[in-house]
């Protein structure tokens, strides 16, 4: 599948996918034959001595090498000191290893440079040597970038360790050395880098075929010969280097943001960059070229090969099909015949070498299920874990974001929905962005209630039943999710009450108590935002996808329109540079704030907005609580899935306590599983206490330990001053408040948003004073009714 780097991929993926991990065929026609070859992956666990912590890697003609910072000897605990943590005074240093074919790591005859000594009588002096980079050198050797860093204390405190401003009084000095080593680790040469004031950034370095080192710095790129002499110092202007890699011809290429993403090569002799291509896409990372391609790069879950001659690129493989995640890779390099060698760090801590080689396409021994998604990167980790744990079923991802182009950002969604309606539906769906309710109403999705009821380990009482009910369509569950967040409005309890939920009348009564000149919400909130959320909140009342019946002429909709009309339109909203929500609330000029609860920490932070006590009151509704549930990530099964047992094995993992506890945070949000939710609450309620420099707990005047913040953040309130928010341990009252909000939320968001868009369009005339509420409701009723029944 080819394209130029001057446009985003528009060629469609072939619907027949490889059984290995190769690229789809370049066709937009269902049933086109897949390539005869794919990629197969073979993993070898790397075995290092106990305590080794490999972090840098290089592949040379002599094989795979690693650099590890590790314990070299036991340290002596200073007299009168106690350990803050095990190994605090261990002697640490660097070792280099060669990795054998069997994965065994053997140490090299390598000695780091000695740490510098203090010859100036500096207080609190310490020094260390670090390995900052590892690259292949000509003739199978190694290039090692080493640093010597000195640190000393310049403050006046008699005991520097007790100086509360210790880090403000510490100065540093660093030197860098480029060492060329033989394959056995013995030194071939060593040169001091002639930095001349250049402050290097060590996040990304590389070397060319002649052993010259390329080192980014602020606004600069330094090029250094093996003896350390500076060959070039190239100004980048406002550019920022995202990635460096060696081209197939031995030169170095860099990915640079400079009024757009651009690919350059470096002319060290002339001291300038030469532009190769201007890119519309945003590559994640560059890898050294070799074999068929001048350069490789990762985009999403695919490895692409670039040919500079015509600017074309080709999908080489899909990482997920190789049981790999690009985020796990520390190294990937071509090794001839189209093969690759890589190093990946797995979630369980194992480090593995992976060999990717072309193999004849053969039938898989496992049942293969397809999962359709609008973004493979959002589902990749879950699919990868499942595939690695299974020997009967394997999931293959169809990523429809590959159809998106610069002119049509909905092309992927259009393609997927078109295929579904044509009968070519994936076995599983990631539901973000999809018309979930419509698909369920058409009978295209599997009813998951029987599967949940038959599950020997999962029980409904283990989950928040109200959250499950909020995801139902026509009284049936078609979706699973590991967790959810809550979109809500928050206000002072003394004004809005202490129980979630209020009616429009109760809202008006509270608003009447605010002083003149106040606003209900912040100056950036407009009526379109409010209308959209209110539509999501009440959609189940106004639209029945199962029957196709709509009722926007319900008096509740007229009341909703009237409520939304009080907010400014989008053109009238503004950013109040002189005051934030926090400032306006503190001054009594703003009644409510929009917020979300995605984690336990959010509850602790949110409460600090209203020191007198707060309530997650939600949007006003005529009954219940107006807090909106938002599934973190939803998955569904096709009603015609090829292996429903296998599909359920995948879906059920998201509901387990183990999954929701282990992957709490970004992947989960607030856990749907009650036990996982309870565990997260318990962790949030753990109190941390102050310690002194020796690790002893500090006590207050009553002999009690002193609680301390677990962290914090600063938020600018007026463009200059900053309000500090501290992350304290959650209190029982806060835990009870969160649980009440969760258990009282009954409505979830429609992630497709099509109906909300129709409502927004139809309401514009009402907000402009051109139509009455009744006329507007009648118009919206007609349009939504037509849309809903077209979709059924």
Residue ranges of each PLM-predicted region?
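Conserved N-terminal structural module of periplasmic/extracytoplasmic solute-binding proteins
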Residues: 22-87, 97-99, 103, 148, ...
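Surface-exposed loop and turn segments in beta-propeller and other repeat-based domains
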Residues: 104-127, 188-198, 319-324, 403-404
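Hinge/lid segment of periplasmic solute-binding proteins
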Residues: 434-488, 505-506, 613-620
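Short, solvent-exposed loop/beta-turn-alpha elements that line the ligand-binding surface or hinge
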Residues: 449-462, 540-561, 618-628, 769
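Extracytoplasmic/periplasmic solute-binding protein
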Residues: 476-487, 506-565, 579, 587-592
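Glycine-centered hinge/linker elements that transmit conformational signals in sensory
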Residues: 547-579, 601-608, 614-620
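Extracytoplasmic/periplasmic substrate-recognition and gating elements
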Residues: 607-691, 705, 744
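Long, aromatic- and glycine/proline-rich binding clefts that accommodate carbohydrate-like moieties
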Residues: 666-761, 765
